[in-house]
C-alpha cells in the first residue's frame, strides 16, 4: 500500500540517465508511436469558453488536461481519480504538465518531401538518386512528370516529361505501356525501389576504374551517403513524410492578453495552414475533383509543410498578420535566440541579483561588501529554515512575515546564515574565467556592492558606474567548489601567462613609488665623510626610525644606513647593513620573512613592473596565504602614502622643451629637401611620402625624448638638495596613470595622425595640448579619434565572435591522463626580431616538460627527459649557453581524446603541474580571446597617433666572429658590400665555436661586416631600405635593355608637379601584340654580348610591373649597383585593426590573397616556356626526384634568376605563406612554429603576453583530421578525411590482423570548419549551420557519446572536466561493477536452469 501511495506522488518517472544520444530519420511508424492522437481540425480554443476545441491543435483529449487532475468537463476532479479517462470528454485525469511532452500527428492526404533533406546542401535526396536539385523541385512542385517504369517504350527511366510530353507519350504508346508519376509520391516510389547494395557495389567499381580527376570525388560523395543509409538503418523513403508530428501544445502556447486578444506562437499558424490544406485536399479527393485542382492543392500542402519546417528556405517567406516572417521549427533551433544558444547553453538562474559597484579599500582580498537588502532577498530560504530551527516561527508563512517586517532577529539570523557562505560576483562581459569569482560577503548599509580594488584588473572593472551580478551557490558541493576553486584568493595568477593578476594599480602604485624615491641632500641624510655627526642617518630598528620620521629629523626619501634583520639560506637569523631610505624600510616591513625574499626585493624604485615582480617572488617562495596577506598590506600602505604625498597634476608640470622649434625647423628643412629631390625626379611620389613620414616620426620621437629629459629632471633647491620630482613624471614612470605617448601629446607634439583608411597624413600636428591646436590641426586629429570610436564598437563584436569560435573548437581538449609516453617533442629557440630578443628561451620553456635530456657543456644533465623545467633550472640553462631545447607539447601528444598532463606542462594559474580533468582547451580559448576584446576597446586611447614600425637593419645580439654562408657579395660603385644573392647568411660564431645566430640577408642589403670580423653586441651587421626592393647587378659591365619598348612595356612618366621623367615598366600583357614580351635588363660585355654568370646563365634580370628603371642603356655598371627598384607599399599604421583580423585569418587558416610560393624540394631553378600570361618555373630537385613546375603570373616579381639554387621551404615568390603549404612542405612542427610566432607577434605589438601553449592547444585542435592517401586493407577510401584517433584505432586493428595499414597526411582545418566537424553533432549544431549539421547527423544515424563539455551542458549533465571528470570516472566504475553483477546473475540463473533441466520431471515439479 505504502508503495502505491509513494507512486501516487511520484507521477512522472525520474529523468533517466544516459551516456549517449543517437539521432536518425524518423519513420512514419515512429511518429505514430509518439503521438497521442490525430489532429483533424485547425481550431485552437473556443473564444467564448476559452476551452480547447476537440481534435484541434490544443485538444485536451490528445494532449492532456488543462488543470492538474481535472478533466475538461469537470466530472472528475482531484487526485483520487488519477488515471481515469472521462467518458464524457475523453480527457485523462492527470497532471497538466503532460501537455509539455505529449505529441500529436497529422495524417497527410498526400506524401510530402522533407525540405531539410531536399534543400540542405548537398541535397541528400538528390545525391541518393543522382538527380539535380532543379529536376527534383520540378517533380515535387508538380511541374514535370518522371518516368518510373518505361516498359517497352523508348522513354528512359527517371526521364522528366512536361505535361504536354506526358500526354503525347500516352497517346503514342498507350496509357498502360509505361508508368510516370508526379509529386512527392513519385520520388517516394523511386526511393522505395532503390537497391542500395547494388548501387554501392557499382560505385566502388567505377571509383576503382575511373581515370579522371574530378569524377571520383563526385562518386565518393554519393557512395558515402549510400553507405550512411546502409549502416544507420534509415530507409530512403523516410525522407518523404506521410505523417507530420505535432509538438506538444505547451511548447507553442496561446496566451490571453488583456482586452480579449491572444498572443500565439507562430507555429500554431503554420500548423493551421498545414491542417487546412490537408483537410481541403482530403475533401477534393473524396469529391473526385479534376486532377489539376488536386495537384495544385498537393503543391500547396507541400509548401505549407516546407514553411512549417523551415520557413523561407524555398520560395517566398510566409508572413503573419503583421508582415513579420513566421518562426518555423528550424528557426526555433538556430541562431543566438534559438533553443541551443538561448535556453540550453545559457540559462537565467534564480538566487541572483545585480547592483552598481563601489570601491571597498578596507575589505580583505577574500571579501566583498553585500548590501543588507540584497543579502536578505538572496538568502531567504536559508533564513526561513534557520528561523524555523531556532523556534522563531512555526510555519514558512510566519517566517515570511518576519522577514518582510525586517524584525531585529532576522538580521541576527542573516549574519549567521551568511557566515562562511561564499557568493559569486560576475561582471559582464565574462571574457575569461576570472570574470566570475567567489567572495565572502560582508553586510553593508547602502545599495551598492563593494569590490576589493585588487581584483578590478581580473574583472576589468572600474567604478564609473559598472554593475556586477551576485550569485549564491546553494548546495554544499557548490559552496565547496566556490571556496576551493573560485575564491579570489585562489586566483592570484593569470591563466594566460602565469603572471600575478592581483597587481596594485593607480593610486597604490603611486603611493609605493613615492615611498621608494631617493632624494639627494634631504634632511637627516647619512654622510660617510661627516666627522661631526658620523651616526646621523644610521638606524638599527624600526621604532627608532619611526620616531625620527615623526620628529621630522629624517624624511621618507633621505639616504640612510639600515641594519636589516632576516633569514639566511638555511632559515637562520642574519643581519646586514644596507644603503636605503626610510620609505623603503617601511615597505620592507610588510614583506614576509623568508630566506628567498631578501631586502633587495624592495630596495629599488618601485614601478608597477617591480611591484608585480615582487608579488611574483613572494608567491613563488612563500605560498598563497602569505601572498594574500602581503597584497592586502601593500594595498593599505600604497593608499595611505599616496594620500599623504598629496601628488597633484598642475599645468606647469607639463614642460615643453625650449628647443622644440629648432628641432621642428630642422625637420621642415629635411622635408623641403625631400620635396626638392622629388621635384628633381630622384625619388618617386611613394618614396617621398615614406621619407617625409619617417622624418616627422623621428622628429616626434626626438622631441618626446627631449621632453622626457626635461620632465624627469629633479628640481633642486638653492642648497643643491632635491626639492621635488615632477608629478606627471611620477604618475607615468611608476605606471600609475598615463603613458609616455600621452605625455608626448601633452607637452611635446601630437605627431602624425592617421586617416580613417589607415594611411598616415603627411603633415603632422606640431602643437601639443598644452599650447593648443589650431583649427587645421584639430580637424586633422578628429579623423583618428572618430575612427577609434567607430572601430571600438565594431571590433568588440568581432573579438567576441573569435572567442566563441575558439571555445567551440577547443572545448573538448581536457587533461585525460598523466603521461601519454610519446618521445616526440618540438624544438624551442629564443625569438629574435630585428636583432632584439623579443622572447627569451628561458621564458618560453619555463614550466614545460623536456623531450630529451638538457645537458650542459661539461656533460652534466641539468634536466632529465620528461621532467618539468622550473625556475631553479634557468640559471644553469642560461649559463650553459643552450640555444635550443626540445620540449613536450600538446601538438605531439598521443592521448586518444584530450591531452596528457606531461605534454601540457604547468598549470599557469596555479604554478603547479596541471590537474587531471582541467579544461585546457577552454582556458586556451579564453586566454587568446580575452585580450582581443581588450585591445579592440583600447584603440582610441592614443587618438590614432600613428606608429611606424618597420625594421631596416640587423644588429648583432651576441659577440663573436663572422662567417658568411653562400657568399655572393659585391662591392658597388660607392664601395659598399652588397648582398647579390638570395641565400646569403651571416653566421655569428661564439668564442666556444657554437653558432650563436644565423641572419639571412635581404637581397640588395648593404653588408657592414665581412668574413672573419669580430663583432660586438649591438653592432650593425647589415641595413637596407625598407621601402624599396632593389634588383642588383651581379657582375660588372654595360647596361642593356631587352623587350623594353616605349609605350608597350615601358613608359616615361613625367611627374606633373616636377616635370621630371622616369622610366617605369607597365603591364605589357594587355594586348595580344605584346603579351609574349619578357622585359629584362642585361649586363653586357664590351662586344655587346650578355656577361655569363658563375652559375652558367646570362646576366639577365627580368623586371616586374611597376619596376622603376634607374640606369640608361649603355651606362657602366659595377657588381652590386642597383639596376631597378620596386616600391613596396607605403607604411600603414599597424594598430590592432591589423591585429584582430590577422589573428582570425591565421586561426581560420585562410589562404592569403597573394600567397607566397614555397619550394617543395631543394634544387635548381630553371625558367621554362611561358604559358599564356604566366611564367613557367621548373625546380629540379637535388635528390633526383621528379621536377616540380610552378606557373607564376607575369607581373609578380620573381627574385630568382635562372640557375639559382633554393633550399626546401625557401620562398620563390614573396608574400605571406599559406599555412597549408607550410604543413605540406615542412611538416607539423614548422607549421606550429609559424602560427605561434605570427599570432604572438600581433599580441606582442600590443604588449599582451600569452603563453605559447595556449596557441598550441588551438593548433592541435585544427590538426585533428587526417586525409587518407592509401586505404591499405581497410574499406576506407583514398581522399577521405577521418579523425587522427580513428586512424590510430583502424591501424591497430589492421596490424593485429597482419594487414596493410592505412596511410594518411595531416590536414589543417580553420577553427570554424574544425568546430563543425567535431565528433559530437550536438556541439556542432549549437555552433553554426544548425540545419545542415542536424540533417547530416540524422542521415548518418550519428551517435553522440557526450565526451566534450558543450554537449554535456546541453543535455544537462555534469561536464566531464574538473570535479565533473571525477564524477564521470566514478560513474564508469559503478557501471562496470553493475554489468559484472548482471553477468554473474545471468550465469547463475543459466546454471540453475541447467540443473533443473537435468532433474527427472517429477523432481523438477
UniProtKB/Swiss-Prot annotation:
Enzyme class: transferase
Record family assignment: Belongs to the RNA polymerase beta' chain family.
Assembly description: The RNAP catalytic core consists of 2 alpha, 1 beta, 1 beta' and 1 omega subunit. When a sigma factor is associated with the core the holoenzyme is formed, which can initiate transcription.
Protein name from the UniProt record: DNA-directed RNA polymerase subunit beta'
Organism: Methylorubrum populi (strain ATCC BAA-705 / NCIMB 13946 / BJ001)
InterPro entries reported in the protein's UniProt record: DNA-dir_RpoC_beta_prime, DNA-dir_RpoC_beta_prime_bact, RNA_pol_asu, RNA_pol_N, RNA_pol_Rpb1_1, RNA_pol_Rpb1_3, RNA_pol_Rpb1_3_sf, RNA_pol_Rpb1_4
Known EC number: 2.7.7.6
Residue positions binding Zn(2+) 1: 71, 73, 86, 89
Main function: DNA-dependent RNA polymerase catalyzes the transcription of DNA into RNA using the four ribonucleoside triphosphates as substrates.
Cofactor(s) required, per the database record: Mg(2+); Zn(2+)
Co-factor remark: Binds 1 Mg(2+) ion per subunit. Binds 2 Zn(2+) ions per subunit.
GO biological process: DNA-templated transcription
A GO molecular-function descriptor: DNA binding
Binding site for Zn(2+) 2: 820, 893, 900, 903
Gene Ontology CC: one annotated term: DNA-directed RNA polymerase complex
Catalytic activity line of the entry: RNA(n) + a ribonucleoside 5'-triphosphate = RNA(n+1) + diphosphate
Binding site for Mg(2+): 462, 464, 466
Domain of life (superkingdom): Bacteria
Keyword Transferase: yes
Matching Pfam families: RNA_pol_Rpb1_1 (PF04997), RNA_pol_Rpb1_2 (PF00623), RNA_pol_Rpb1_3 (PF04983), RNA_pol_Rpb1_4 (PF05000), RNA_pol_Rpb1_5 (PF04998)
Keywords, sorted A to Z: DNA-directed RNA polymerase, Magnesium, Metal-binding, Nucleotidyltransferase, Transcription, Transferase, Zinc
SUPFAM superfamilies registered for this protein in UniProt: beta and beta-prime subunits of DNA dependent RNA-polymerase
